[in-house]
């Protein structure tokens, strides 16, 4: 539960959970989300009642994100950990099926891009900015590796 930034802070602290039913992240940077809202409000093409969703077309498994933080910001010396398993055994037994279902998800942003002209930030840029903010502003403590 909660925004993905909270989950990143738990990764930095070395104590994060597996996503429910092994759902990957499809993150959109909050700055891009805000830009989409503003551009849609300013648009004369949006009709009353139309719905738009800003999806990420990149899917990230939660267990790969912690390692990605270490690759993007080696200077913080993050101790890469595995997520805590939160699923009951009956769901753990179906992990491969759940992951296959999520891999088949075909999320697209063509409508949003066409309407707003937005270019979405890469997940690497969003993740790096998020981690740096969590450390510098929120004071998140990083579980560091012993090297």
Regions found by a protein language model. Give the residues of each.
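Flexible, glycine-rich beta-alpha linker
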Residues: 1-4
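Alpha-helical substrate-binding/gating segment
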Residues: 8-52
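Conserved C-terminal active-site "lid" loop/helix of NAD(P)H-dependent oxidoreductases
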Residues: 30, 88-117
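Short amphipathic alpha-helical molecular recognition features
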Residues: 22-25, 57, 104, 115
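Short, charged alpha-helical segments
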Residues: 107, 118-129
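Mid/C-terminal beta-alpha module of Rossmann-like enzyme folds, strongest
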Residues: 36-95, 123, 129-147
